[in-house]
Protein backbone atom coordinates (compact mmCIF):
# COMPACT_ATOMS: atom_id res chain seq x y z
CA UNK A 1 0.00 0.00 0.00
CA UNK A 2 2.73 2.48 0.94
CA UNK A 3 4.76 1.78 -2.21
CA UNK A 4 1.65 2.65 -4.23
CA UNK A 5 1.36 6.04 -2.58
CA UNK A 6 -1.13 4.98 0.05
CA UNK A 7 -1.52 6.54 3.47
CA UNK A 8 -0.64 4.97 6.80
CA UNK A 9 -4.35 4.28 7.24
CA UNK A 10 -4.57 2.56 3.84
CA UNK A 11 -1.71 0.28 4.89
CA UNK A 12 -3.09 -0.36 8.37
CA UNK A 13 -6.60 -1.16 7.11
CA UNK A 14 -5.19 -3.49 4.45
CA UNK A 15 -3.12 -5.30 7.09
CA UNK A 16 -6.12 -5.50 9.41
CA UNK A 17 -8.24 -7.14 6.71
CA UNK A 18 -5.44 -9.60 5.93
CA UNK A 19 -5.12 -10.47 9.62
CA UNK A 20 -8.87 -11.17 9.72
CA UNK A 21 -8.24 -13.94 7.18
CA UNK A 22 -4.76 -15.11 8.18
CA UNK A 23 -4.82 -14.81 12.00
CA UNK A 24 -8.28 -16.10 12.71
CA UNK A 25 -7.51 -17.68 16.06
CA UNK A 26 -6.89 -14.11 17.24
CA UNK A 27 -9.14 -11.85 15.18
CA UNK A 28 -11.68 -11.78 12.38
CA UNK A 29 -14.44 -9.86 10.64
CA UNK A 30 -16.76 -10.93 13.46
CA UNK A 31 -14.77 -9.01 16.08
CA UNK A 32 -14.07 -5.41 17.03
CA UNK A 33 -11.22 -3.03 17.69
CA UNK A 34 -9.71 0.40 18.20
CA UNK A 35 -7.49 2.72 16.17
CA UNK A 36 -5.32 5.71 17.03
CA UNK A 37 -4.41 7.97 14.10
CA UNK A 38 -1.82 10.78 13.84
CA UNK A 39 -2.15 13.50 11.19
CA UNK A 40 1.30 14.99 10.58
CA UNK A 41 -0.05 18.09 8.83
CA UNK A 42 -2.10 19.17 11.84
CA UNK A 43 -0.14 17.24 14.55
CA UNK A 44 -3.55 16.07 15.77
CA UNK A 45 -4.32 12.61 17.16
CA UNK A 46 -7.74 10.96 16.90
CA UNK A 47 -9.11 7.73 18.37
CA UNK A 48 -11.67 5.44 16.78
CA UNK A 49 -13.79 2.94 18.71
CA UNK A 50 -15.16 0.17 16.53
CA UNK A 51 -15.28 -2.36 19.34
CA UNK A 52 -18.30 -4.57 19.91
CA UNK A 53 -21.51 -3.34 21.50
CA UNK A 54 -23.91 -5.16 23.80
CA UNK A 55 -26.88 -6.69 21.94
CA UNK A 56 -30.49 -6.76 23.11
CA UNK A 57 -32.07 -3.66 21.55
CA UNK A 58 -34.64 -5.93 19.91
CA UNK A 59 -35.86 -7.04 23.32
CA UNK A 60 -34.55 -10.59 23.14
CA UNK A 61 -32.88 -12.01 26.24
CA UNK A 62 -29.92 -14.39 25.93
CA UNK A 63 -30.00 -17.97 27.13
CA UNK A 64 -27.23 -19.33 29.35
CA UNK A 65 -23.87 -19.61 27.58
CA UNK A 66 -21.76 -22.77 27.30
CA UNK A 67 -18.97 -22.99 29.88
CA UNK A 68 -15.54 -24.22 28.81
CA UNK A 69 -12.01 -24.20 30.20
CA UNK A 70 -8.77 -23.38 28.45
CA UNK A 71 -5.33 -24.24 29.81
CA UNK A 72 -3.11 -21.21 29.74
CA UNK A 73 0.42 -21.29 31.16
CA UNK A 74 -0.55 -24.26 33.31
CA UNK A 75 -3.76 -22.67 34.62
CA UNK A 76 -7.32 -23.79 33.91
CA UNK A 77 -9.19 -20.62 32.99
CA UNK A 78 -13.01 -20.64 32.67
CA UNK A 79 -14.74 -19.02 29.69
CA UNK A 80 -18.09 -19.07 27.99
CA UNK A 81 -18.93 -19.54 24.33
CA UNK A 82 -22.04 -19.96 22.20
CA UNK A 83 -24.67 -17.59 20.74
CA UNK A 84 -25.26 -15.85 24.07
CA UNK A 85 -21.65 -14.57 24.06
CA UNK A 86 -21.82 -12.87 20.65
CA UNK A 87 -21.76 -9.06 20.72
CA UNK A 88 -22.35 -6.73 17.76
CA UNK A 89 -19.23 -6.83 15.51
CA UNK A 90 -17.48 -3.61 14.55
CA UNK A 91 -14.53 -4.44 12.29
CA UNK A 92 -16.33 -4.05 8.93
CA UNK A 93 -17.67 -0.63 9.95
CA UNK A 94 -14.34 0.41 11.44
CA UNK A 95 -12.31 -0.55 8.37
CA UNK A 96 -14.52 1.47 6.04
CA UNK A 97 -14.71 4.48 8.38
CA UNK A 98 -10.92 4.64 8.66
CA UNK A 99 -10.50 4.49 4.89
CA UNK A 100 -13.18 7.11 4.24
CA UNK A 101 -11.61 9.46 6.79
CA UNK A 102 -7.91 9.10 5.97
CA UNK A 103 -7.47 6.82 2.94
CA UNK A 104 -5.84 7.81 -0.35
CA UNK A 105 -6.04 4.68 -2.49
CA UNK A 106 -9.19 3.18 -4.05
CA UNK A 107 -11.17 0.93 -1.70
CA UNK A 108 -10.69 -1.98 -4.12
CA UNK A 109 -6.92 -1.63 -3.79
CA UNK A 110 -7.03 -1.49 0.01
CA UNK A 111 -9.25 -4.57 0.30
CA UNK A 112 -7.47 -6.66 -2.35
CA UNK A 113 -4.83 -8.28 -0.07
CA UNK A 114 -7.53 -9.39 2.36
CA UNK A 115 -9.58 -10.88 -0.46
CA UNK A 116 -6.54 -12.81 -1.64
CA UNK A 117 -5.81 -14.06 1.88
CA UNK A 118 -9.43 -15.20 2.29
CA UNK A 119 -8.75 -18.07 -0.12
CA UNK A 120 -6.16 -19.51 2.25
CA UNK A 121 -2.82 -18.79 3.91
CA UNK A 122 -0.15 -20.95 5.61
CA UNK A 123 -0.91 -21.54 9.29
CA UNK A 124 1.80 -19.79 11.36
CA UNK A 125 3.95 -21.88 13.69
CA UNK A 126 3.04 -19.81 16.75
CA UNK A 127 -0.66 -20.24 15.98
CA UNK A 128 -0.12 -23.99 15.77
CA UNK A 129 1.32 -23.86 19.29
CA UNK A 130 -1.63 -21.86 20.62
CA UNK A 131 -4.43 -23.78 18.87
CA UNK A 132 -4.55 -26.77 21.26
CA UNK A 133 -5.02 -24.35 24.17
CA UNK A 134 -8.08 -22.73 22.56
CA UNK A 135 -9.52 -25.70 20.68
CA UNK A 136 -12.57 -25.82 22.94
CA UNK A 137 -13.74 -22.58 21.31
CA UNK A 138 -12.13 -22.85 17.89
CA UNK A 139 -12.91 -26.45 16.96
CA UNK A 140 -16.69 -26.09 17.17
CA UNK A 141 -19.14 -26.15 14.27
CA UNK A 142 -17.48 -24.95 11.08
CA UNK A 143 -14.27 -24.57 13.05
CA UNK A 144 -13.76 -28.34 12.99
CA UNK A 145 -13.24 -28.21 9.23
CA UNK A 146 -11.12 -25.06 9.48
CA UNK A 147 -8.73 -25.96 12.30
CA UNK A 148 -8.52 -29.75 12.16
CA UNK A 149 -7.04 -32.12 9.62
CA UNK A 150 -9.07 -34.94 8.10
CA UNK A 151 -7.69 -37.35 10.75
CA UNK A 152 -8.96 -35.11 13.56
CA UNK A 153 -5.58 -33.68 14.54
CA UNK A 154 -5.06 -29.94 14.79
CA UNK A 155 -3.54 -27.84 12.01
CA UNK A 156 0.24 -27.74 12.09
CA UNK A 157 2.64 -25.02 11.00
CA UNK A 158 2.48 -24.54 7.25
CA UNK A 159 -0.87 -26.28 6.79
CA UNK A 160 -3.36 -24.27 4.72
CA UNK A 161 -5.70 -22.15 6.83
CA UNK A 162 -8.88 -21.76 4.86
CA UNK A 163 -12.39 -20.82 5.90
CA UNK A 164 -14.92 -22.19 3.41
CA UNK A 165 -16.85 -19.32 1.77
CA UNK A 166 -14.68 -16.70 3.46
CA UNK A 167 -14.05 -15.04 0.11
CA UNK A 168 -17.77 -14.22 -0.06
CA UNK A 169 -17.42 -12.02 3.03
CA UNK A 170 -14.46 -10.20 1.47
CA UNK A 171 -16.34 -9.72 -1.79
CA UNK A 172 -19.09 -8.16 0.31
CA UNK A 173 -16.51 -5.92 1.97
CA UNK A 174 -15.41 -4.72 -1.46
CA UNK A 175 -18.93 -4.03 -2.73
CA UNK A 176 -20.44 -2.42 0.34
CA UNK A 177 -19.16 -2.74 3.94
CA UNK A 178 -22.57 -1.56 5.15
CA UNK A 179 -23.95 -4.88 3.91
CA UNK A 180 -22.47 -6.52 7.03
CA UNK A 181 -25.24 -4.72 8.93
CA UNK A 182 -28.15 -4.98 6.47
CA UNK A 183 -29.28 -7.56 3.94
CA UNK A 184 -28.39 -11.21 3.36
CA UNK A 185 -25.25 -11.31 5.53
CA UNK A 186 -27.00 -9.58 8.43
CA UNK A 187 -29.92 -11.98 8.11
CA UNK A 188 -27.54 -14.95 8.22
CA UNK A 189 -25.77 -13.54 11.28
CA UNK A 190 -29.01 -13.03 13.19
CA UNK A 191 -30.13 -16.57 12.37
CA UNK A 192 -26.74 -17.98 13.43
CA UNK A 193 -27.10 -16.54 16.95
CA UNK A 194 -30.87 -16.99 17.25
CA UNK A 195 -30.64 -20.15 19.36
CA UNK A 196 -29.69 -18.44 22.62
CA UNK A 197 -28.25 -15.10 21.53
CA UNK A 198 -29.74 -11.64 22.01
CA UNK A 199 -28.37 -10.03 18.83
CA UNK A 200 -31.03 -8.77 16.41
CA UNK A 201 -31.37 -6.54 13.37
CA UNK A 202 -32.11 -3.64 15.72
CA UNK A 203 -28.63 -4.03 17.20
CA UNK A 204 -27.00 -4.04 13.76
CA UNK A 205 -29.02 -0.98 12.71
CA UNK A 206 -27.83 0.95 15.75
CA UNK A 207 -24.12 0.17 15.41
CA UNK A 208 -21.78 3.06 14.55
CA UNK A 209 -18.11 3.95 14.84
CA UNK A 210 -17.18 6.46 17.56
CA UNK A 211 -14.45 9.03 16.84
CA UNK A 212 -13.02 10.96 19.78
CA UNK A 213 -10.18 13.10 21.06
CA UNK A 214 -7.68 10.97 22.98
CA UNK A 215 -6.58 11.43 26.54
CA UNK A 216 -2.90 12.29 27.01
CA UNK A 217 -0.25 12.13 29.74
CA UNK A 218 3.34 13.30 30.00
CA UNK A 219 5.98 10.58 30.13
CA UNK A 220 9.53 11.88 30.39
CA UNK A 221 9.71 14.59 27.69
CA UNK A 222 6.91 13.20 25.55
CA UNK A 223 3.13 13.39 25.38
CA UNK A 224 1.52 9.97 25.05
CA UNK A 225 -1.95 9.83 23.49
CA UNK A 226 -4.42 6.93 23.73
CA UNK A 227 -8.15 6.49 24.12
CA UNK A 228 -7.87 6.68 27.90
CA UNK A 229 -10.93 4.65 28.88
CA UNK A 230 -9.42 1.19 28.60
CA UNK A 231 -10.23 -1.18 31.43
CA UNK A 232 -6.65 -1.32 32.74
CA UNK A 233 -5.81 2.44 32.66
CA UNK A 234 -2.77 2.16 30.42
CA UNK A 235 -2.00 5.88 30.41
CA UNK A 236 -2.36 6.22 34.15
CA UNK A 237 -0.01 3.29 34.63
CA UNK A 238 2.59 4.80 32.30
CA UNK A 239 2.39 8.10 34.15
CA UNK A 240 2.94 6.32 37.48
CA UNK A 241 5.65 3.94 36.26
CA UNK A 242 8.00 6.39 34.54
CA UNK A 243 9.15 8.24 37.70
CA UNK A 244 9.66 5.12 39.83
CA UNK A 245 11.27 2.76 37.29
CA UNK A 246 14.56 4.57 36.96
CA UNK A 247 16.62 1.73 35.55
CA UNK A 248 16.33 -1.43 33.49
CA UNK A 249 14.10 -3.94 35.33
CA UNK A 250 16.06 -6.85 33.87
CA UNK A 251 19.24 -5.70 35.62
CA UNK A 252 18.02 -3.46 38.48
CA UNK A 253 16.02 -5.10 41.27
CA UNK A 254 14.59 -1.84 42.59
CA UNK A 255 13.21 -0.94 39.17
CA UNK A 256 11.81 -4.46 38.76
CA UNK A 257 9.99 -4.26 42.10
CA UNK A 258 8.57 -0.82 41.28
CA UNK A 259 7.34 -2.09 37.92
CA UNK A 260 5.69 -5.12 39.53
CA UNK A 261 3.90 -3.01 42.11
CA UNK A 262 2.53 -0.72 39.39
CA UNK A 263 1.41 -3.56 37.15
CA UNK A 264 -0.31 -5.87 39.60
CA UNK A 265 -3.33 -7.22 37.73
CA UNK A 266 -5.27 -10.50 37.52
CA UNK A 267 -4.50 -12.99 34.77
CA UNK A 268 -7.03 -13.70 32.06
CA UNK A 269 -6.74 -14.66 28.45
CA UNK A 270 -7.97 -12.77 25.42
CA UNK A 271 -6.66 -12.83 21.90
CA UNK A 272 -5.91 -9.75 19.88
CA UNK A 273 -3.96 -8.59 16.86
CA UNK A 274 -2.07 -5.30 16.52
CA UNK A 275 -0.87 -3.35 13.49
CA UNK A 276 1.08 -0.09 13.10
CA UNK A 277 1.96 1.92 10.00
CA UNK A 278 3.64 5.23 9.15
CA UNK A 279 3.58 6.75 5.65
CA UNK A 280 5.91 9.03 3.68
CA UNK A 281 4.15 12.14 5.01
CA UNK A 282 4.79 11.11 8.62
CA UNK A 283 1.19 10.15 9.34
CA UNK A 284 0.73 7.18 11.66
CA UNK A 285 -1.96 4.63 12.45
CA UNK A 286 -2.13 1.90 15.09
CA UNK A 287 -4.97 -0.62 15.12
CA UNK A 288 -5.74 -3.35 17.64
CA UNK A 289 -8.51 -5.87 16.98
CA UNK A 290 -9.87 -8.96 18.70
CA UNK A 291 -12.29 -11.84 18.36
CA UNK A 292 -12.06 -12.66 22.05
CA UNK A 293 -11.61 -16.37 22.53
CA UNK A 294 -14.15 -17.04 19.76
CA UNK A 295 -17.78 -18.05 20.26
CA UNK A 296 -17.84 -21.22 18.17
CA UNK A 297 -20.68 -19.61 16.17
CA UNK A 298 -20.11 -19.04 12.44
CA UNK A 299 -22.07 -17.03 9.88
CA UNK A 300 -23.14 -19.73 7.38
CA UNK A 301 -22.13 -19.14 3.79
CA UNK A 302 -19.52 -16.51 4.68
CA UNK A 303 -16.87 -18.31 6.77
CA UNK A 304 -16.93 -15.68 9.53
CA UNK A 305 -16.36 -16.77 13.13
CA UNK A 306 -18.20 -14.51 15.57
CA UNK A 307 -16.75 -12.97 18.71
CA UNK A 308 -17.27 -14.23 22.27
CA UNK A 309 -16.90 -10.90 24.08
CA UNK A 310 -19.90 -11.46 26.35
CA UNK A 311 -18.19 -14.64 27.54
CA UNK A 312 -14.96 -12.84 28.45
CA UNK A 313 -15.28 -12.39 32.20
CA UNK A 314 -12.55 -9.76 32.44
CA UNK A 315 -14.52 -7.47 30.11
CA UNK A 316 -17.70 -7.59 32.21
CA UNK A 317 -17.29 -5.11 35.05
CA UNK A 318 -20.69 -4.26 36.40
CA UNK A 319 -23.99 -4.28 34.53
CA UNK A 320 -24.04 -4.19 30.74
CA UNK A 321 -26.93 -2.61 28.88
CA UNK A 322 -28.07 -3.14 25.28
CA UNK A 323 -26.51 -0.70 22.84
CA UNK A 324 -23.51 0.32 24.95
CA UNK A 325 -19.92 -0.37 24.00
CA UNK A 326 -18.16 -3.12 25.89
CA UNK A 327 -14.95 -2.30 27.71
CA UNK A 328 -11.57 -3.54 26.58
CA UNK A 329 -7.88 -3.53 27.49
CA UNK A 330 -6.93 -2.66 23.91
CA UNK A 331 -5.35 0.79 23.64
CA UNK A 332 -3.09 1.60 20.66
CA UNK A 333 -1.05 4.70 21.47
CA UNK A 334 0.96 7.50 19.89
CA UNK A 335 3.72 9.55 21.55
CA UNK A 336 4.65 13.02 20.30
CA UNK A 337 7.65 15.18 21.13
CA UNK A 338 7.40 18.80 22.22
CA UNK A 339 7.25 19.90 18.56
CA UNK A 340 4.23 17.70 17.87
CA UNK A 341 6.29 15.25 15.83
CA UNK A 342 5.79 11.51 15.98
CA UNK A 343 8.15 9.95 18.54
CA UNK A 344 6.57 6.51 18.87
CA UNK A 345 3.52 4.60 17.75
CA UNK A 346 2.69 1.24 19.28
CA UNK A 347 0.02 -1.23 20.17
CA UNK A 348 -0.16 -4.66 21.70
CA UNK A 349 -2.09 -7.89 21.64
CA UNK A 350 -2.61 -10.10 24.64
CA UNK A 351 -5.66 -9.29 26.75
CA UNK A 352 -4.63 -8.40 30.27
CA UNK A 353 -0.96 -8.44 29.21
CA UNK A 354 -1.53 -5.54 26.80
CA UNK A 355 -0.86 -2.99 29.52
CA UNK A 356 2.36 -4.52 30.93
CA UNK A 357 3.69 -5.23 27.44
CA UNK A 358 3.08 -1.68 26.20
CA UNK A 359 4.33 -0.04 29.38
CA UNK A 360 7.62 -1.94 29.28
CA UNK A 361 8.22 -1.54 25.54
CA UNK A 362 7.17 2.10 25.18
CA UNK A 363 9.10 3.19 28.27
CA UNK A 364 12.25 1.70 26.72
CA UNK A 365 11.52 3.45 23.42
CA UNK A 366 10.99 6.83 25.06
CA UNK A 367 14.34 6.37 26.77
CA UNK A 368 16.16 5.89 23.48
CA UNK A 369 15.79 2.23 22.52
CA UNK A 370 14.97 1.31 18.94
CA UNK A 371 11.57 -0.41 18.59
CA UNK A 372 12.95 -3.89 17.90
CA UNK A 373 15.41 -3.64 20.78
CA UNK A 374 12.60 -2.59 23.11
CA UNK A 375 10.32 -5.38 21.91
CA UNK A 376 13.01 -8.05 22.19
CA UNK A 377 13.88 -7.15 25.79
CA UNK A 378 12.68 -9.64 28.44
CA UNK A 379 9.31 -8.83 30.03
CA UNK A 380 7.50 -9.62 33.21
CA UNK A 381 3.81 -10.06 34.01
CA UNK A 382 2.70 -9.18 37.53
CA UNK A 383 -0.20 -11.29 38.77
CA UNK A 384 -1.80 -10.82 42.20
CA UNK A 385 0.15 -13.71 43.74
CA UNK A 386 2.90 -14.43 41.21
CA UNK A 387 5.41 -12.65 39.00
CA UNK A 388 6.06 -14.39 35.69
CA UNK A 389 9.35 -13.47 34.04
CA UNK A 390 10.84 -14.26 30.68
CA UNK A 391 14.39 -15.60 30.43
CA UNK A 392 16.97 -12.82 30.52
CA UNK A 393 16.40 -11.22 33.93
CA UNK A 394 19.64 -11.15 35.92
CA UNK A 395 19.79 -13.82 38.60
CA UNK A 396 20.48 -11.24 41.30
CA UNK A 397 17.28 -9.41 40.33
CA UNK A 398 15.26 -12.61 40.74
CA UNK A 399 16.94 -13.41 44.07
CA UNK A 400 16.25 -9.89 45.34
CA UNK A 401 12.58 -10.10 44.34
CA UNK A 402 12.18 -13.44 46.09
CA UNK A 403 13.91 -12.19 49.24
CA UNK A 404 11.45 -9.27 49.28
CA UNK A 405 8.51 -11.68 49.21
CA UNK A 406 7.67 -11.78 45.50
CA UNK A 407 6.88 -15.29 44.30
CA UNK A 408 8.45 -15.73 40.86
CA UNK A 409 8.16 -18.16 37.96
CA UNK A 410 10.61 -18.12 35.05
CA UNK A 411 9.23 -19.06 31.65
CA UNK A 412 11.15 -21.60 29.58
CA UNK A 413 11.20 -19.27 26.59
CA UNK A 414 9.58 -16.16 25.17
CA UNK A 415 5.88 -16.89 24.95
CA UNK A 416 2.77 -15.29 23.39
CA UNK A 417 1.49 -15.02 26.96
CA UNK A 418 3.68 -11.94 27.47
CA UNK A 419 1.88 -10.06 24.72
CA UNK A 420 2.69 -9.17 21.15
CA UNK A 421 3.81 -5.59 20.48
CA UNK A 422 4.31 -3.79 17.18
CA UNK A 423 5.92 -0.37 17.17
CA UNK A 424 7.48 2.37 15.04
CA UNK A 425 9.67 5.36 15.85
CA UNK A 426 12.22 7.54 14.04
CA UNK A 427 14.74 4.82 14.95
CA UNK A 428 12.93 2.15 12.94
CA UNK A 429 10.23 -0.48 13.24
CA UNK A 430 9.76 -3.47 15.48
CA UNK A 431 7.53 -6.54 15.53
CA UNK A 432 7.15 -9.16 18.21
CA UNK A 433 8.62 -12.63 17.63
CA UNK A 434 6.44 -13.86 20.49
CA UNK A 435 3.45 -13.68 18.12
CA UNK A 436 5.10 -14.20 14.73
CA UNK A 437 5.25 -10.47 14.07
CA UNK A 438 7.05 -9.07 11.05
CA UNK A 439 8.25 -5.72 9.73
CA UNK A 440 8.12 -4.28 6.21
CA UNK A 441 10.29 -1.20 5.60
CA UNK A 442 9.86 0.72 2.34
Residues covered by each model-derived region:
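Noncatalytic scaffold domains of N-terminal-nucleophile
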Residues: 3-4, 8-175, 180-182, 187-224
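Active-site rim segments in enzyme catalytic domains, especially the processed small/beta chain
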Residues: 21-25, 34-47, 283-344, 355, ...
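Short Gly/Pro-enriched turn/cap motifs at secondary-structure boundaries
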Residues: 25-26, 85, 158, 205, ...
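Short beta-strand scaffold segments in enzyme catalytic cores
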Residues: 27, 31-39, 215, 273-278, ...
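N-terminal accessory/precursor segments of enzymes
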Residues: 47-101, 223-248, 326-381
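C-terminal catalytic domains of large/alpha subunits in multi-subunit enzymes
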Residues: 209, 251-269, 279-280, 312, ...
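Short, small/polar residue-rich loop motifs at catalytic or cofactor-binding pockets
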Residues: 211, 269-272, 328-330
